């Protein structure tokens, strides 16, 4: 028996027509393009009470819902999955309260910052409070946030124990600690980021320079424990960011952002 041909010649015009239709390439669909923002606003907000346990991801969802409820005319990114133009910077860790968190939003229409503040504050959950909204220039927020001032309440320890731990920590040239990050376990120096560290009763106040990786107050507490083994907090410390802005490394003064 003769071998069957590998390719058969198709002469049926109807079959050829169907094959031609199937073979047509699918037209390429361009993603939707959105106009750039006509106005940028800087939002200063606080995390108070139980809202301090809100994760950064959960806050982002709550904030986007608040924008919709408040009727803020957001600008959107272009592409297949457009999202509102929101720029976050140096968010406080989950569990920390804050009086000075910042983000920026890009708008599709010019709005009165005070009206946006009032509408957003009314739309956000209790404990997430909008402190101030001002006009801003895009793309500079992270560069302007160079330091933070924190209060750390350490219940159950005497002022003498806190002072001894602070003195031992400050006497070191370098204090390496480890922390799990999204990129795995990282080891970094906490001492270089500490500009001031003071003790008042059962409370610490610490001024931190923002560096990479970002040193947090809980990292400083871990470093204090390494420097002073007697420093063992009985109850979980309560962290509160009091200020964030431009840091003068010589004086340790934080200048809050305005415009």
What does each model-identified segment do?
Residues 39-51, 105-106, 146-162:
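Terminal, regulation- and interaction-focused segments at domain boundaries
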Residues 113-124, 162-171, 220-221:
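Short amphipathic alpha-helices in soluble, non-transmembrane regions
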Residues 7-8, 16-23, 35, 171-259:
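Core RNA-modification/binding signature centered on pseudouridine synthases
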Residues 108-113, 157-159, 211-213:
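Helix N-cap motif at beta-to-alpha junctions
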Residues 150-182:
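A contiguous pocket-lining binding segment that forms or flanks enzyme active sites
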Residues 17-65, 69-72:
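Short, extreme N-terminal leader segments that mark the start of a protein/domain
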Residues 99-151:
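Ordered, amphipathic secondary-structure segments that act as subunit-interaction surfaces
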Residues 50, 75-107, 137:
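Short, charge-patterned binding micro-sites
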């Amino acid at each position: 028996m003769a071998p069957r041909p590998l390719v058969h010649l198709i002469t049926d015009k109807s079959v050829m027509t169907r094959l031609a239709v199937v073979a047509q390439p699918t037209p390429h669909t361009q993603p939707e393009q959105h106009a750039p923002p006509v106005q940028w606003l800087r939002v200063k907000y606080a995390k108070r009470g139980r809202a301090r346990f809100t994760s950064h991801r959960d806050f982002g969802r709550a904030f986007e819902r608040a924008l919709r409820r408040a009727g803020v005319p957001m600008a959107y990114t272009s592409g297949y999955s457009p999202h509102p133009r929101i720029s976050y910077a140096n968010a406080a860790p989950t569990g920390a309260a804050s009086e000075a968190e910042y983000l920026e939003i890009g708008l599709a229409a010019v709005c009165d910052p005070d009206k946006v503040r009032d509408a957003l504050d009314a739309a956000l959950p209790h404990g997430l409070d909008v402190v101030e909204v001002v006009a801003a220039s895009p793309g500079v927020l992270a560069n302007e946030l160079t330091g933070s001032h924190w209060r750390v309440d350490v219940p159950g320890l005497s002022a003498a124990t806190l002072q001894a731990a602070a003195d031992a920590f400050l006497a070191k040239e370098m204090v390496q600690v480890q922390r799990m990050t999204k990129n795995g376990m990282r080891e970094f120096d906490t001492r270089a980021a500490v500009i001031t560290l003071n003790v008042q009763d059962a409370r610490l106040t610490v001024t931190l320079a923002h560096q990479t990786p970002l040193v947090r107050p809980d990292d400083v507490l871990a470093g204090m424990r390494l420097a002073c083994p007697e420093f063992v907090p009985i109850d979980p410390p309560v962290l509160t960011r009091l200020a964030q802005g431009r840091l003068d490394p010589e004086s340790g003064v934080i200048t809050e952002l305005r415009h």
